[in-house]
A protein has these predicted regions:
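Extracellular, repeat-based ectodomains that mediate carbohydrate processing or recognition
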Residues: 1-208
Length: 208
């Protein structure tokens, strides 16, 4: 069990994504009662990766977009960054895949690691990740998700699946934690040069 991340589905249902080393990436849903004394599994080990290859599913992160639509980011066995969308029923018993895209490139070793996503507006997502050169460098990348269909898209008229990209650190961008402060203001905590900790703030427009 590595890279676990939670999202809330409804008042007492939660989704957990994680990487099972050598077996792929999985999504499991749980019901947790009001006083947290009872935890019951609703959907067990739904595999969200394309394969069960050794490294498929690393750096998994899940985000609730709204109206039962969820976004999962991860890296596959060929070191490619992948975005997938799913619907999850309110009771957590049904998980349905909607779309799958290589965010940066379908070429091997394009890298998208240490992922942390936030919702920008109802159809735009920002992700902090490392990438490009041997999984180094710190990046912020934005992309669109149709909230009703789950279709992932980039800037209008572009073949890319991302809207925009910003390299904020030329050396390193690991252990990312990206949060929205409010309005168009965002703050990122991450590990950079020398494994030192850094905090950087950004503005991101609603359209990414």
């Amino acid at each position: 069990f590595f890279y676990g991340d939670w999202a809330k589905v409804d008042a007492n249902t939660y989704a957990l994504v994680y990487w099972d080393y050598g077996n792929g990436g999985y999504l499991t849903t749980f019901d947790i009662n009001d006083d947290a004394s009872t935890i019951s599994t609703k959907k067990s080990r739904h595999r969200f990766t394309q394969s069960t290859s050794t490294n498929d599913g690393r750096f998994s992160d899940i985000l609730e977009l709204g109206s039962n639509m969820f976004v999962v980011a991860y890296e596959d066995n060929s070191n490619r960054g992948i975005i997938k969308t799913f619907t999850i029923s309110d009771d957590g018993s049904t998980v349905t895949e909607k779309d799958f895209e290589y965010l940066i490139s379908s070429s091997s070793n394009s890298y998208m690691e240490w992922n942390s996503m936030v919702k920008v507006d109802n159809n735009t997502v920002a992700i902090a990740h490392s990438g490009a050169v041997n999984a180094a460098e710190g990046w912020i990348t934005t992309f669109n998700v149709d909230p009703s269909t789950g279709v992932i898209s980039g800037a209008s008229g572009s073949s890319n699946k991302y809207v925009n990209r910003l390299k904020h650190d030329n050396v390193l961008g690991k252990y990312n934690s990206l949060v929205k402060l409010g309005g168009d203001k965002y703050v990122l905590a991450y590990s950079g040069s020398g494994e030192d900790g850094f905090i950087t703030s950004f503005t991101i427009s609603d359209d990414g």
